[in-house]
Curated annotation (Swiss-Prot):
Gene name per UniProt: rpsU
InterPro entries, A to Z: Ribosomal_bS21, Ribosomal_bS21_CS, Ribosomal_bS21_sf
Segments forming a coiled coil: none
Annotated protein name in UniProt: Small ribosomal subunit protein bS21
Top-level taxonomic group: Bacteria
Family per record: Belongs to the bacterial ribosomal protein bS21 family.
Recorded GO CC terms: ribonucleoprotein complex; ribosome
Region entry Disordered, spans: 36-58
Composition-biased stretches (Basic residues): 45-58
Record key words, sorted: Ribonucleoprotein, Ribosomal protein
């Protein structure tokens, strides 16, 4: 779960930007899209293949 603590002198906009960045890094939106619709075995294979390729680059 992503959590952001707003500092005493920090604006809401900057806290919201930090929250969006953390959600993006955690991959929450991608997982939400994946869980929202049925995924065929071929789609699952392609997704995992793509993940492996991405992890090799890093």
């Amino acid at each position: 779960m992503t959590q952001v603590t707003v500092g005493e002198n920090e604006g809401i906009e900057s806290a919201l930007r930090r929250f969006k960045r953390q959600v993006s890094k955690a991959g929450i939106f991608g997982e939400l899209k994946r869980l929202r619709h049925h995924e065929t075995p071929v789609e699952k294979y392609k997704r995992k293949l793509q993940q492996r390729r991405r992890s090799r680059r890093r």
